[in-house]
Amino acid sequence: MSNVNTLSALAKSGALSGKRVFIRADLNVPFDDAGRISEDTRIRASVPGIRLALDAGAAVMVTSHLGRPKEGALTEADSLAPVAQRLSELLGMQVRLVPDWVDGVSVEPGEVVLLENCRGNVGEKKDDEGLSRKMAALCDVYVNDAFGTAHRAEATTHGIARFAPVACAGPLLEAELDALGRALHDPKRPLVAIVGGSKVSTKLSILQSLADKVDQLVVGGGIANTFMLAAGLPIGKSLAEPEQVEQARAVIEIMKRRGAEVPIPTDVVCAKSFGADAAATVKAAADVAEDDMILDIGPQTAQRLADILKTAGTIVWNGPVGVFEFDQFAHGTEVVARAIADSAGFSIAGGGDTLAAIAKYGIADQTGYISTGGGAFLEFLEGKALPAVAVLQARAA
């Protein structure tokens, strides 16, 4: 999968000594009301790539987007200043913040500077060629270490990579591409995918793409309700998309023709209303009443999925199978999560809700790989080319 140049290979070969290295990281972190960083995972994840370049004797420039500022009109709230401070603490050295950096940056070997929010530059979002060429002129080596933005063709993720003398993947991006390639391009069978979420329409292209590849396609959440409708089961007043039933049937049909399966729930957990205090009732799937809402899979279905997952060679997990935020509707997602943790197969998980479930059940160490990309992870599952990766592949060819 990763037929790209890598920062680790360049560092090992001694090619970075005295060179100017430009790293596009993903430092788009959340802030609390007082303007303090509330969660710094992405900043910590960027440190190995920065250290690698510093230890190899490079002069290092790092940039990232933060939020969605107006190009050419950054405000104080859009500034990477708090990120520079946190990065200084993590690296144990001063990290200067450089504003207005497109026309030139002074940085010495062994030093690292943070270039102010790249989305402040006019032309960033449009992947402007003039801006891309100017940024490429700042460096000897361009590094993309931001998988989370790999599905976007912007000046710092795509354009600069076309014109920099050398363009490569940082360690974070390299690990992500290796894990995704292992899961989808050369998977150990059986390959099981779990796709949860509220709407078939938003995940339809993923479901269609996976229907050609996987041995078991487990659907969860509102998506499962639409598949239950397609299988002729009652769903009461559950969240579903009746207009997507034909598409759901087509996915089931593709799987069936390949000797593969979409396991439809045989029992479910229902409530009369949606909320933290709603009373939960387990019912056979055929017995759902008109005023019922399906909010989780039942214990029998959960056990069946656990058995499938325990014997899987590869697992791709995107989305919970129930409303796991409420404990009475969390059993299905917990059983699935623990089965993934116990499976001997290679697992890759991605998407915000999935990461929240992994954190809730404390299984991060037992998950093969946790993807840092939301939209990029989904587009990869769809089989789409990611512009930021495609340009690195083209430069390595």
Curated annotation (Swiss-Prot):
Which cysteines in this chain are paired by disulphide bridges? none
Residues that bind ATP? K203, E325, G351, G352, D353, T354
Documented EC number(s): 2.7.2.3
Any GO BP annotation: gluconeogenesis
Q: What keywords is this UniProt entry annotated with?
A: ATP-binding, Cytoplasm, Glycolysis, Kinase, Nucleotide-binding, Transferase
A cellular component term, taken from the record's GO annotations? cytosol
Involved pathway(s): Carbohydrate degradation; glycolysis; pyruvate from D-glyceraldehyde 3-phosphate: step 2/5
Report the subcellular localization. Cytoplasm
The UniProt entry, under InterPro entries, shows: Phosphoglycerate_kinase, Phosphoglycerate_kinase_CS, Phosphoglycerate_kinase_N, Phosphoglycerate_kinase_sf
> According to its UniProt record, where is this protein mainly located?
cytoplasm
The residues the record assigns to binding substrate are D26, L27, N28, R42, H65, L66, G67, R68, R119, R152
Gene3D superfamilies on file: Phosphoglycerate kinase, N-terminal domain
A Pfam family this chain is assigned to: PGK
Query: Which family is it part of?
Result: Belongs to the phosphoglycerate kinase family.
This protein's name? Phosphoglycerate kinase
